[in-house]
Amino acid sequence: EFRRVLFRSIPEVVHEFHTSTQGLDVDTAAKRLHENGPNRFDEAKKDSLAKKILRSLMDFTTIVLLVAAAISFYTAIATDHGDYFEGLLIIAIVVINSVLAIYQEGNAEKALEALQDMNKQTALVIRDGQQQEINAEELVVGDVLVLENGSMVTADARLIQTSQMRIEESALTGESEAVEKDADFVAEEELPLGDQLNMVFKGCTVVNGRGRGIVTAVGMDTEMGKIAGLLGSNT
């Protein structure tokens, strides 16, 4: 399984991804791009405010509260005691819950938009044995990604070469301290992302050194893509 590259040596990774340390040829890269699609996150559909309100009102708990409010109002009218406080309080709770739900959905949409800005990056790769700059959306699995100090990582990759490389991974791990990477590291057990020393991940930044890596996942298959998928499901 390609996802197990954490446990593979560099020659094994090269073999499994049908590539070389000198990169893919242009024709193979074009074929893989056509077969697997571009290296970008899916764009979530934005619902209208009216649809968001309707969706919040269709929540089971909200429906129960609305029924309770209706019963309270009916009782107040039927008994002619004129005490509508309980019903109004329930309606107020429903309104507050709906506003909070819509607000949280809006925050998720903004976070997803920020992630989608990563679609607009460029990347350095080795193709036909030559280093070249391409649109990051054109990256494919098996590409050799060139990473330099200050570069943003534009796809998940298994490192094959490192020189004093440190990566800032707070976007994924929440850890502010940069992680020193080692292309020769081979894991013997499952590790959290922050301890995967032979891997780099889309959306993280090189803060020192340089290196190269074989792209192992693009777009929604990356670790950052999984986050984008979760955010998209909440909008």
Residue ranges and their predicted role:
Residues 3-235:
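Conserved cytosolic headpiece of P-type ATPases
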